[in-house]
UniProtKB/Swiss-Prot annotation:
The gene is ubiD. Pathway: Cofactor biosynthesis; ubiquinone biosynthesis. It holds the Pfam family UbiD_N. This is 3-octaprenyl-4-hydroxybenzoate carboxy-lyase. It catalyses: a 4-hydroxy-3-(all-trans-polyprenyl)benzoate + H(+) = a 2-(all-trans-polyprenyl)phenol + CO2. It comes from Methylococcus capsulatus (strain ATCC 33009 / NCIMB 11132 / Bath). Homohexamer. The keyword Lipid metabolism does not apply.
Length: 498
């Protein structure tokens, strides 16, 4: 598998590429990070507009970069592809890494050579004198107030760091975990680390507390890493592969990392800003409320406090930020692009899957539509349960709709037609109770625990129905071709207005 592999060394390389293609605009006016930047970015994103570099945000000498991944194409560019459709190749790569197969012969081995070459880029490369450590701040010089951290919505509890790349390592693991966990600012050197209990960072912290009770847990937070590293942290990377390794595959070059000053954690060498510090045992604080990707404010809940004891940064750093709100927002756009990555991964496990679609209106992952080549009675239910169980990204998907391969999974007119003509509610709804649900989903009766429902909107096979199944109406192919030939000459829409 060959890829374009755009080798952006850092965020600034990516900014230059976007600006050259008219995909980024510089904003010279002084705009307030308190609410105003959210409104500007939201209007721009909803119009499929460019990334925005606010050069003079009010109250800060540090520029703010927003709406970076505000279109699927910019996500694709960040992953080294030129189009959203090409992201299927990223999924093919991930599927082969998740379940590698030995070559079936010499010819197959030669065909796999490009993949083997790419694997050489997986191991990160440690460097010294990294750009991210050009300036080092300690003690009283540490002040998060120097950065234009957004307060996104009127009901938010305060400023929120929204694109933090959090690096952790558990006591039993050699590899580090990278994840995006938002952080509420509660002091000049303190934030609240909001991570859910099943996320990698939270699991590392739990294991650390068990193995080393009473000891502070080292954490590093990179702000403004290169696009491959950032996107690697939100992609369904196999458990055997580090996010740094996957970023190297995307980039076509090994990820450069550098050791932290306060710990042995490794951070992206080209990051704009790095926060180093510790989680101290027993120190928690109530987080929220904040406007979230659901379009609602989330509930207040306690999470660990992150105490920052060192900040390193590049000369003239850039602060990367986003906002979340009712779709479409940046997470929804990321979901649309990453949807293409998921398809080959599912198809590797379930070859009968034709397409898989996460509508952005479904808050990125809460509703999925799957089209499949049905082969036996009960087959749709097998695929349904496969979606819920195969990738952890879909453990929170509340609604799964399964349709036949003659239905376009991305066309609601097709999907609704299939649901209303191929479903009997009593037979074709599968309801599961007491399953894991996103704790932000206030519709569930208990926080973190709720129900899921599957819709079997496929043709029914013997054993699923006793009736003769309906035959879809289709025009004869020869008639369609004949009408295609004479269509323009009929002049039916000639001179029509609008």
């Amino acid at each position: 598998m060959s890829r374009n592999g755009a080798k952006y060394r850092d965020l600034r390389d990516f900014i230059a590429r976007l600006e050259a293609e008219g995909e980024l605009r510089r904003i010279g006016a002084s705009v307030d990070p308190n609410l105003e930047i959210t409104e500007i970015c939201d209007r721009t994103l909803k119009s499929e507009g460019p990334a925005l570099l606010f050069e003079h945000p009010k109250g800060s000498a540090v520029p703010l970069l927003g709406n970076l991944f505000g279109t699927p194409r910019r996500v694709a560019l960040g992953m080294g592809e030129v189009s959203v459709g090409a992201l299927r190749q990223v999924g093919v790569l991930l599927a082969s890494l998740k379940e590698p197969e030995p070559p079936k012969g010499m010819r197959d081995a030669f065909e796999k050579v490009p993949l083997y070459r790419q694997v050489l880029h997986m191991a990160p490369k440690e460097v010294r004198n990294a750009p991210c450590q050009q300036e080092v701040l300690r003690g009283s010089d540490i002040d998060l107030g120097r950065y234009p951290i957004q307060t996104c919505w009127p009901g938010d509890a305060g400023p929120l760091i929204t694109w933090p790349l959090v690096i952790t390592r558990g006591p039993y693991k050699a590899r580090q975990n990278l994840g995006i966990y938002r952080q509420q600012v509660i002091g000049r050197n303190k934030t609240i680390m909001r991570w859910l209990a099943h996320r990698g960072g939270a699991l590392d912290f739990r294991d650390w507390q068990e193995a080393r009770p009473g000891e502070p847990f080292p954490v590093a937070v990179a702000l403004g890493a290169d696009p491959a590293t950032m996107l690697g942290a939100v992609t369904p990377v196999p458990d055997t592969l580090s996010e740094y390794g996957f970023a190297g595959l995307l980039r076509g070059a090994r990820t450069e990392v550098t050791p932290c000053i306060l710990s042995d954690l490794q951070v992206p060498a080209s990051a704009e800003i790095v926060l180093e510090g510790f989680l101290y045992p027993g120190e928690t604080a109530p987080e929220g409320p904040f406007g979230d990707h659901t379009g609602y404010y989330n509930e207040v809940e306690s999470f660990p406090v992150f105490t920052i004891e060192c900040i390193t940064q590049r000369h003239s750093p850039i602060y990367h930020s986003t906002y979340t709100g009712r779709p479409p927002d940046e997470p929804a756009v990321l979901g649309v692009a990453l949807n293409e990555v998921f398809v080959p991964i599912l198809q590797k496990q379930f070859p009968e899957v034709v397409d898989f679609y996460l509508p952005p209106e479904g808050c990125s992952y809460r509703l999925a539509v799957v089209s499949m080549k049905k082969q036996y009675a009960g087959h749709a239910k097998r695929v349904m349960f496969g979606v819920w169980s195969f990738l952890r990204q879909f453990m929170y998907t509340k609604f799964v709709i399964v349709v036949d391969d003659d239905v376009d999974a991305r066309n609601w007119k097709d999907v609704v037609w299939a649901m209303t003509t191929r479903m009997d509610p009593a037979r074709d709804l599968t309801l599961i109770e007491n399953t894991p649900i996103d704790y932000l989903d206030f519709a569930s009766p208990v926080s973190g625990l709720g129900s899921k429902v599957g819709f079997d909107a496929t043709h029914k096979w013997p054993g699923e129905t006793n009736r003769e199944w309906g035959r879809p109406i289709t025009m004869d192919a020869a008639v369609r071709r004949r009408v295609d030939e004479i269509w323009d000459s009929l002049g039916i829409f000639a001179g029509s207005r609008g």
